[in-house]
Amino acid sequence: EFYFIEMNTRLQVEHPVTEAIFGVDLVREQIRVASGLEMSFQQDDLEINGHSIEVRLNAEKLPNFSPSPGRITQYHAPGGLGVRMDSALYDGYSIPPYYDSLIGKLIVHGRDRAEALARLNRALGELIIDGVDTTVPLFHGLLAEKDIHTGDYNIHWLEKWLDTLSD
């Protein structure tokens, strides 16, 4: 049997970051264009506004990121200014073992990187997902690292950091 796990024919999974920075609902614009309408803005109308971060929340057990299927016993989404939670989770939701482990995307926006990181820290603190293991502790750990706040990292940084945790 074959399953389509995800089809990104137009939008990327990170599109909420673009939406937050530019203040444009990309899905709405896509539907407008598909309906034969023009977009509701011009290229010159777009202005970069602040900094946005998205973390992909997965039902995975650390440190090896193995799948963590099961039933959500308690769920509370964070909220507030500059916080967006995209998820279909609810109390009692059953996460099957057959598909991608992505269970939500937490997107934050602030005037600058420092404010976005502070909002991410607050939002992760408000977020409750009980009943399965998730990658939320990974993001708490990352936010405690100076390099994340200063932007002093590269594509190998995470792998090296994870190695230090398992030592």
Specify the residue positions occupied by each region the protein language model found.
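ATP-dependent carboxylate activation and anion-phosphoryl transfer catalytic cores
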Residues: 1-167
